[in-house]
Amino acid sequence: MKILVLSTGGTIGSATKDGVMSPDKNATALLVLLYESSFQDVAEFDCESVSDILSENVTEPFYEKLINRLLAVDTEKYDGVIVLHGTDTLAYTSSLAAMVCRSLPIPVGFVGANYPLKHPKSKAFVNFRAAVEYLKAGGRGFFVPYENSDGKTYIHLATRLTEADFLHDDFHSLGDAVLAEFKDGKIIFSNDSRLPSQEELSKPLSGITDGEFELSGRVVLLKSYPGLDYSELRIKHDNVCAVV
């Protein structure tokens, strides 16, 4: 099995020095080396850097670069892709990629961590291992593995993932419907009827773009709340093409 590992930065791609966390170009290589030294595995890894940014700072150019790299993956060469990504916007990126890159015939996982790899509380290694084991077990689709504060590691369908909660930094899926659980070194598929089956996930859908993917920054998202006075809102039509 050959896996392409794409690093984008984030906490999982960072290191802490003198109490300050910053991107570390060696983080991905260290994570893969730690995995390879811990398990006599059949998996081979190719590592590539797409970006080196904390995920709360991502913009449209970041998404365009990552999506276009995924669309260009040699699916004859690789059995799967693992994207290392920050947790702050993990739900946004994984869901967007799942929708735009739905024509890919190979599975794509998004792996993040709450602390840098060398921190004793980091979940980088277990989340990465869960992603590899999911691929080895024949798991399909766009997925996100994450170990929560209760010690349980779930494999989420990317399009059902919610943002991490503010109390424990745990990740959940809508309705708690997950693809699988990673337990005792093994993947246990849930076969939840509320989610697409592994067979359905293995069938690529028609692509939504024929050329380079471009993400418009001219869409405004309004989050309503009780008492919001819409009459006070002023939107310059020249700069906006849609309002959600």
Where are these regions (language model features)?
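Active-site histidine-anchored catalytic micro-motif
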Residues: 1-242
